[in-house]
Amino acid sequence: MSLEMFDKEIFDLTNKELERQCEGLEMIASENFTLPEVMEVIGSILTNKYAEGYPGKRYYGGCEFVDEIETLAIERCKKLFNCKFANVQPNSGSQANQGVYAALINPGDKILGMDLSHGGHLTHGAKVSSSGKMYESCFYGVELDGRIDYEKVREIAKKEKPKLIVCGASAYARVIDFAKFREIADEIGAYLFADIAHIAGLVVAGEHPSPFPHAHVVSSTTHKTLRGPRGGIIMTNDEELAKKINSAIFPGIQGGPLMHVIAAKAVGFKFNLSDEWKVYAKQVRTNAQVLANVLMDRKFKLVSDGTDNHLVLMSFLDREFSGKDADLALGNAGITANKNTVPGEIRSPFITSGLRLGTPALTARGFKEKEMEIVSNYIADILDDINNEKLQENIKQELKKLASNFIIYERAMF
């Protein structure tokens, strides 16, 4: 029996989501379009197999084939990131980070991470997260120019003396200097942990410096700029840390791994290792630079005055409207983005004075400089006349026509 016959409600909603993804423009920086091959294996019989433990050391029988699958995923991950050890079992980036903390430090120890309101992530010590409840957290941020001042990070680190420093961000448009972070960590005897969830796809293509050999441990998601399935990974070059990480993930915080997702990670890594991937990642950055340049030419303020990676962060501190207003206006025109706090923030985190835009998903559809220039100017048009609902509807129809030339999926399920 087909899904349509068995559960028409879910079938219909999934197809409505397909329509939304195909007809609108996805510009949330953390979202992307994965491969049909990735979705195909996620929907496979591998979902049936329990495989607690690691390849060759399982608690259940019948794991000979999933052992080979996980080993493939591990080897491809190691080759991709040029590292010696990899754990591909974390179910998410947050769980990967939780596993790193559990492996490297003890509850109550101090961690130093980027402030959430400055572009960090919940799992980097935010008080509302378990990372901010289980561990004592302190923070560094960006200056009013939107950039990290590494001397200030050094001052904070020397004063606070954390056991672990987290570098990585969810809304930082500039290159992260991993070598500088390692210098600071070494000065105080701390671990350096790099969370590259947002930039991993650029890192493996040589479009952003690698955290290796500087970081003791590196984590990432496998979606975002990697375009794989939703999930997490942890990597290191230190064998002793690798053993601790493996124990922290299983049996520490997870039970049976999701073998259908691990297989999908392996498929994604195969794509990331191809020459085609390097072309894609380069275009992601090029498209982001086009977006940044058009918006600045149209007199909009960007945090750090540009971008080095896949995202731009707009600041509306000099405007009467908020990030939430901009988010809603673009949404009315078929462009999905997200409101975001900015340096010098004057509004609440639920309103914000910024907007985060990313190019990975549009690039996955085949958008290049020409299309990005069109889209960027439409964004500026909308924000220049933010209450003009008729304009938003007209642009929505124009973008729908543009999107129809770049259909990413012909069907909702694979």
Curated annotation (Swiss-Prot):
- Keyword tags: Amino-acid biosynthesis, Cytoplasm, One-carbon metabolism, Pyridoxal phosphate, Transferase
Q: Which residues bind (6S)-5,6,7,8-tetrahydrofolate?
A: 116, 120-122, 240, 348-350
Q: Which GO terms describe its biological process?
A: glycine biosynthetic process from serine; tetrahydrofolate interconversion
Modification sites for N6-(pyridoxal phosphate)lysine: 224
Q: Chief subcellular site?
A: cytoplasm
User: NCBIfam families this protein is in?
Assistant: PRK00011.1
The entry's protein name is Serine hydroxymethyltransferase
Origin species: Campylobacter jejuni subsp. jejuni serotype O:6 (strain 81116 / NCTC 11828)
